[in-house]
Amino acid sequence: MREKFTGSETVEVLYTIGEQDRIAGITGYTVRPPEARKEKPKVYAFTSGDIDKILAVKPDLVLTFSDLQADIARDLINAGVPVYAFNQRSIDETLGMVETIGRLVGAEDKALRMVAELEAQIAAAKGLAAARIARSGRRPRVYFEEWDEPNITAVRWVSELIEIAGGENIFADRAASPLARDRILADPLEVVARAPDVIIGSWCGKHFRPERVSARPGWSTVPAVVHGRLHEIKSAIILTPGPVAISEGLPLLLDILDIEAR
């Protein structure tokens, strides 16, 4: 079976479980693992491109992600190509995605081992966070910003990772919405009112600018700004709903919150 995988998350899983030879093509936005960009043909962008390039690699199955690729899925189905659409938005759903990929390619045992390793990392992080909370007696309040204009707060899996790492997402009430538009702050002063101890920026596609955040009108009294507690985590790590958010994003969150607890 030759699969064509459209998302970086699915490509990462296939490489990790040793099934990369099944990959017939990737999107131009695939970044993990780095060797995929060298070894696999790029046959599509993420939401646009020439569907004939996908058909040219003769895939037996195409994996897509979310409503963002609904048009691609429709066109492929109309062309007679089987499509499996993922829509993972939480840590549990991400682990389920790994398991499902394993079943789809006949490598369920290897996928389950990968899930077990990720679950072990989560358990270890919870233990470290619990020890820190026991010492300090508190969870740092975190404002996570995934875009600056307008201000967009953390998506669900990021909010969950913040909690696992021992923090408190100050906009956890918004995190359940899969749509970014539902996580836009109508008034940036909402951040001031919720007084985060730590600000973490992950502006998708561009560098986080802490000096710009600190200079926002009315933000000078925010504890994170007063104490210079502004950090960046690269969007390719933390805003990817795949294994990398757990294996690399979670340790970075732990490190940031460890620093702020000292």
Q: What label would you give each PLM region?
A:
Residues 1-262:
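N-terminal ligand-binding lobe of clamshell/alpha-beta domains
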